[in-house]
Amino acid sequence: MIALDTNVLVRFLVQDDAKQAAAATSLIQRSSRKAPAWLSREVMIETVWVLESAYDRSPAEISNVLFGLLEAEEIIIEEASDVAVAAEAYGVAGADFADHMIASAAIRSGAETIYTFDKKAARHNFATFLVK
């Protein structure tokens, strides 16, 4: 197994730098079910942020990318169930992907709700806005 940093994953996804994109694509194509590429939760969160801020991708587009990565047999995503729940909510709910990841982890951990002062994060149906 190998691990990928955000910049390698982004180069693979956007193919905007020919040399780096070729290297990233080659590396990922060499991955397999027996020798997978591993992506951390942090890489997933940072990748979404980069796709939003630097490449102006919409939440729906990014959610589709995330589901494609989740379905790839040669890629293992840390806490994949959190990423799947967050990707689904992110595509439709309006809060930041990182907020959805926080809520997904809290749900998985058995929390009853997650309290926040962040109005956007409170859009998640699991979150409770602390001060109105």
Question: PLM features: what roles do these ranges have?
Answer:
Residues 48-49, 87:
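Amphipathic alpha-helical segments within well-ordered protein domains
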Residues 1, 103-132:
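Acidic, PIN/NYN-like endoribonuclease modules and their adjacent C-terminal/linker elements
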Residues 11-13, 50, 124-125:
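Residues that scaffold the ATP/ADP-binding catalytic core of kinase and kinase-like folds
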Residues 74-117:
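Active-site neighborhoods of divalent-metal-dependent phosphate/nucleic-acid chemistry enzymes
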Residues 8, 43, 82, 101-102, ...:
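Alpha-helix capping/helix-boundary segments
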